[in-house]
């Protein structure tokens, strides 16, 4: 319009003052800065110091913060804090008007692209692969072959164990035990072996019971009697005083094992010390009847059976004994040569009532009581052989 007026003025004849005013106005219009682009956010400008907050306070719009979280809108209407201040990513209420935030310049009102992750793409292995029938058949064949092989291995192991058990030493041991039981059956009665050696030459006698058989070689007519027992008939009588344990029930067996046992026992007794021999034969219980203070002396024409044994060597001398026996034997001279057994057997003295001849037998030393003379097994060079008991009295029953 101004231009049209200017053209009219230029086209017509106008005064010079009007032309000058129009030129100044055009210069002012050209010197004015542009107001800005359309749709662009307005820049925050400093507010005038006298700027007042809108009625009811300023309102902060909702926005997405730097963490991608949505912050809802809020009003700044708390007293003096009536202005929305801060930045686009962090907003708060303040009382300073010049620090007011121009919210039109911010663009974080929509969901950021980096927040929308979405669903990850499906992997290839998640998709079902097509089934191969040929491959499945091959797997089935492998399983069947392995099962059959395992069954065959188990069957072989079982057969091997059965054969080993059938031929094991336990089965052979059972057969051997049966054969041993058959061989242990008792055989025919055999005579006893010969005596185990020369007599020991001692005067030790051990009385046994009457349970020995009649046909025993140790029960012959020339058996030895007790030293202090009267000579008379051999009729058995009731036992008087205690006997050696196990003597009444001992019977001779022809078994070789028992013979070997007797032989070993005799050899051990012969080699043992006198103290061991005394411990082997326990002492008998004392008789309830007390002996007289002094025994009656026999007649001089009778031999003294207590001085020396008939089968003892010539150099044997009986040991001294305390008591009445020592007093009686000390007054008698030692006999240089004892009478032989048949001669000693010929003498008969009246026996005391209740006494009877007992059969003599030794389990450990059967040779001691055999009717053998001292010269049968000994010689002048070897010397006398007799068993020393290392005691004051002889062991008699």
From Swiss-Prot:
It is a single-pass type I membrane protein. The chain crosses the membrane at residues 139-159. GO terms for biological process: regulation of short-term neuronal synaptic plasticity. GO terms for cellular component: AMPA glutamate receptor complex; dendritic spine membrane; postsynaptic density; postsynaptic membrane. Residues 188-197, 288-303 have a biased composition (Pro residues). Residues 160-397 are cytoplasmic. Residues 39-138 are extracellular. It comes from the Eukaryota. Pfam families: Shisa_N (PF13908). InterPro entries: Shisa, Shisa_N. Keywords: Glycoprotein, Membrane, Signal, Transmembrane, Transmembrane helix. Residues 1-38 form the signal peptide. Its main location: membrane. Residues 117-136, 182-250, 281-303 are annotated as: Disordered. It is found in: Membrane. Glycans are attached at residue 75. Residues 123-136 have a biased composition (Basic and acidic residues). May regulate trafficking and current kinetics of AMPA-type glutamate receptor (AMPAR) at synapses. Interacts with AMPAR subunits GRIA1 and GRIA2. Belongs to the shisa family. This is Protein shisa-8. It comes from Homo sapiens.
């Amino acid at each position: 319009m101004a231009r049209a007026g200017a053209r009219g003025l230029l086209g017509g004849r106008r005064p010079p003052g009007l032309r000058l005013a129009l030129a100044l106005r055009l210069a002012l219009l050209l010197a004015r800065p542009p107001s800005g682009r359309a749709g662009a956010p307005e820049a925050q400008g400093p507010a005038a110091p006298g700027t007042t907050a809108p009625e009811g306070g300023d309102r902060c719009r909702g926005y997405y913060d730097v963490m991608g979280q949505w912050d809802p809108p809020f009003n700044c209407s708390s007293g003096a804090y009536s202005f929305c201040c801060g930045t686009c990513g962090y907003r708060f209420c303040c009382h300073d008007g010049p620090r007011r935030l121009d919210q039109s310049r911010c663009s974080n009102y929509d969901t950021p692209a980096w927040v929308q992750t979405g669903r990850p793409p499906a992997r290839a292995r998640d998709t079902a692969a097509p089934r191969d029938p040929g491959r499945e058949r091959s797997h089935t064949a492998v399983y069947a072959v392995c099962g059959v092989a395992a069954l065959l291995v188990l069957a072989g192991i079982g057969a091997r164990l059965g054969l080993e058990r059938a031929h094991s030493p336990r089965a052979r041991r059972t057969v051997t035990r049966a054969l041993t039981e058959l061989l242990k059956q008792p055989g025919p009665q055999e005579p006893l072996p010969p005596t185990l050696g020369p007599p020991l030459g001692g005067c030790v006698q051990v009385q046994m019971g009457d349970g020995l058989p009649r046909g025993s070689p140790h029960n012959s007519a020339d058996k030895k009697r007790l030293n202090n027992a009267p000579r008379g008939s051999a009729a058995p009588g009731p036992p008087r005083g205690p006997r050696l344990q196990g003597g009444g029930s001992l019977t001779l067996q022809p078994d070789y094992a028992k013979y070997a046992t007797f032989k070993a026992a005799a050899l051990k007794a012969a080699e043992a010390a006198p103290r061991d021999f005394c411990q082997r034969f326990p002492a008998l219980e004392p008789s309830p009847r007390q002996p007289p203070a002094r025994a009656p002396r026999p007649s001089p024409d009778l031999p003294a059976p207590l001085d020396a044994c008939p089968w003892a060597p010539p150099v044997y001398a009986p040991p001294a004994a305390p008591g009445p026996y020592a007093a009686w034997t000390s007054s008698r001279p030692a006999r240089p040569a004892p009478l032989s057994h048949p001669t000693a057997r010929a003498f008969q003295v009246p026996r005391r009532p209740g006494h009877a001849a007992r059969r003599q037998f030794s389990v450990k030393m059967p040779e001691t009581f055999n009717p053998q003379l001292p010269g049968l097994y000994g010689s002048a060079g070897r010397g006398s052989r007799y068993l020393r008991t290392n005691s004051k009295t002889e062991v008699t029953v």
